[in-house]
């Protein structure tokens, strides 16, 4: 009986570990301009390129809040830049917003890939003791795989300072995914000493 319980717990912990290891956000690609000689940026215009205005506002505001929490000034572009139907923002429009807010950098994030999968996990029977058993019901869950590209530009020169592609595999809400991506990007920018408190 004890052996069966131990085996059952082992399977349970293995399952939990698998679920945890499959969640979260990773930067699968990053590129830093080695020729960039400017100082770390400290006042950033945030632009989320999407046709979904709710997601845009939410993402930009979360990014601003997270940057401010580490001492970096930031502003969302939602009030100064209208999103075109083709999602192609003109350079002049961005520069006008930069001039309005006096930013020294621009961060632009856009979706480059998304998959949603519904997975059904069949139930089973766990046996214990001599004749005892329990039946585990099946369940279904939805897993999202989201890939976002985030670029950091020098506001004065338009030079690309840093670029990263994040991959998030999660069953969490869109808001949780946004938070994961933002925190991962900021951590990498700090690691590369590209942002600093103003």
Where are these regions (language model features)?
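N-terminal segment of the mature soluble domain
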Residues: 43, 47-116
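Surface-exposed short loop/turn segments
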Residues: 88-152, 156
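C-terminal/domain-edge helix-coil "capping" segments
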Residues: 22-42, 137-198
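Residues that form or immediately flank small-molecule/cofactor binding pockets and catalytic motifs
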Residues: 10-13, 51, 79, 157
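Generic marker of residues within folded, mature protein domains
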Residues: 5, 12, 36, 99, ...
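Sec-dependent bacterial lipoprotein signal peptides
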Residues: 1-22
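Short low-complexity stretches enriched in small and charged residues
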Residues: 29-34, 59-72, 120, 194-198
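Alpha-helix termination/capping residues and helix-transition junctions
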Residues: 16-19, 38, 100-103
């Amino acid at each position: 009986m004890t052996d069966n319980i131990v085996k059952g717990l082992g399977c349970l912990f293995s399952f939990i570990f698998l679920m945890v290891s499959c969640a979260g956000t990773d930067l699968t690609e990053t590129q830093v301009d080695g020729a960039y000689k400017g100082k770390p940026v400290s006042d950033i215009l945030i632009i989320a390129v999407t046709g979904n205005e709710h997601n845009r506002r939410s993402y930009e505001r979360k990014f601003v809040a997270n940057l401010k929490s580490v001492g970096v000034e930031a502003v969302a572009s939602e009030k100064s830049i209208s999103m075109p139907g083709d999602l192609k923002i003109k350079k002049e429009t961005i520069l006008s917003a930069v001039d309005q807010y006096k930013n020294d950098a621009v961060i632009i994030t856009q979706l480059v890939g998304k998959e949603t999968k519904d997975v059904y996990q069949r139930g089973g029977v766990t046996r214990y003791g001599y004749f005892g058993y329990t039946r585990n019901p099946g369940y279904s869950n939805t897993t999202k795989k989201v890939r976002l590209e985030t670029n950091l530009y020098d506001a004065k020169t338009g030079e690309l300072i840093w670029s990263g592609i994040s991959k998030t595999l999660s069953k969490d809400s869109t808001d949780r995914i946004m938070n994961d991506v933002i925190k991962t990007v900021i951590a990498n920018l700090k690691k590369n000493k590209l942002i600093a408190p103003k």
